[in-house]
Amino acid sequence: MNRYKQVLNFEPVDRLPITYSYPVSPDARWQPFPNRYIYQNPAVMFYNELVSAWDLHITDRALILDDLPVTIRPNWGTVTVASLLGIPPEQRDDQTPWIRRRDENITLEDIGSLDVDIREYRWIQNILETYEYYHEVVAAYPKFGEMVTITLPDLQGPFDTLEQIMGEQLFIDMVLEPERVKESLLKVARLQKECIDLFQPYCTEQIPGYSHQHGTMLKGNLLIRNDSVVMISPRMYEDIVAPGDIFLMKEVGGGAIHSCGKIDHATDVMFELEGIQSFDLGQSYLNDMDRIYRKAKEKKIPLIRVQPDREELISGSILERYPTGVTLTFRSQSRDDAIQVHEAYKRAVERRRKK
């Protein structure tokens, strides 16, 4: 954890912290249950969190000896806040839950008139029941409880949540009624804050100002997902979407922003937001990372889950590109491949230290 804190504060570090993702081998000792069962039994959800969450494997941590933290979350998908906006989530077979929009679209007027008591909603109750089970297990196994961090669930962000409910109409409304969209996003942000306040007492984050999501440590107390920003201009983000993000980050005492895809068109605007403390990339390789890193270093905003290529790791050149301020994740072919790459990475770090 100390290595993470050093990197997240742009301090000198022996090496960049790294995690390894890979598919579960058919002959692996620990096999995840099919996804459908995690929604039927909290013990299965708990087990799968340890065996294979985001293709990260806490059960292999002692073999790889990487920097994977031991974290578990109520894994009820991306629909928790969206479930409060008028459409119940659906879940079938091994798919993750989703929102199926109705034939009659939900409008900005519908969002504005909503009066929600979040405790009455089934998805909120599901998460609370999962938290309660997790705490029963931790209480029964106190040594494990000392190791594990129970985190917030995936609450998305105001823009991604409203997009789930409204679909393409949201983007039309952003052009025709930008102020009403901004107000709707702020309403969704307030609902998200209610969820945070309800779930936070169940979380066991140990260091104020830092939290865990996506199998890694962040600087900030909340991760706002902003995948849908890849589809809008920086100006639209700044004028319409950012106020909701700023509200949340101020309310929680600082936060992080996440986006998958190619997001470098908007990072300059995001790095100026009040309250932003780190930035998580789902697909760093799609972006101009050298330009992003220069700006991040200037603003002291650490970059989370940058994905190096194999040669950068085994040669150690990744440390020349990013001396600090970056955490890494590497997509391996298998557990054995992860072990080999990590050993090569550590040898490269040691060679550089001796120069």
Regions found by a protein language model. Give the residues of each.
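A short glycine/small-residue-enriched secondary-structure motif
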Residues: 23-36, 75, 97-112
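N-terminal accessory alpha/beta regions
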Residues: 56-90
